[in-house]
Regions:
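A Zn2+-metalloprotease active-site environment signal
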Residues: 3-190
Length: 190
């Protein structure tokens, strides 16, 4: 969508300062029911049409795009992939040459599950990058907060303390508070 590229262009320009030479390729996935976006190694960013529909204004969409750009700048997907490969290699060594394919499959699934999401630190770093890119691009700094508030409403409540303890993702409410603190400290609330 041309509008989405226009919104992303200044964010990508700001990200070049932190990761010169990186390329960013945006693809919209047609699924109005999915309110999600993700980044993968190589600068590929995927945004579901449901997220674009859910974003009420450019600042909300810019906030999400900037956050995903932050994952690429932080090399979070690449680091996750390297970690996953390392776990699979160690599993293969530990299982030995005599291991059945079934055992190898289990090891591979376990490796994928162990790194299925970005870490809490990765998410916070992507939020920091994203907030900076949004502000430097002239978008409302509270756009990402507003979008996370929508996600929180969609989630329909908070996680239990056990879910929070074992989650690699900070809770949406926690992320909202963290971003509000970042905005307050930066003095850029718009």
């Amino acid at each position: 969508c041309i509008r989405d590229r226009r919104i992303a262009a200044p964010l990508v320009e700001r990200a070049q300062v932190d990761r010169p030479g990186a390329t960013y390729r945006f693809t919209v996935l047609d699924d109005p029911a999915q309110v999600n976006a993700f980044a993968v190694p190589g600068g590929f960013l995927y945004v579901y049409s449901g997220l674009i529909i859910a974003a009420e204004d450019e600042a909300e969409l810019a906030g999400v795009l900037a956050h995903e750009i932050g994952h690429i700048v932080g090399r979070h997907s690449a680091n996750q992939l390297a970690s996953q490969f390392g776990i699979q290699l160690l599993s293969a060594i530990a299982l030995g040459e005599e291991a059945s394919e079934y055992a190898v499959d289990i090891a591979q699934i376990a490796a994928q599950l162990s790194s299925a999401r970005f870490s809490r630190d990765d998410e916070r770093q992507a939020d920091r990058y994203g907030l900076r890119y949004v502000v430097e691009s002239g978008y409302d700094s509270t756009g990402l907060v507003r979008f996370f508030e929508k996600l929180s409403a969609l989630e329909g409540g908070k996680r239990t303390s056990v879910e929070t303890l074992f989650s690699s993702h900070p809770a949406t409410e926690e992320r909202i508070r963290d971003i509000e603190v970042m905005i307050e400290r930066s003095g850029v609330a718009t």
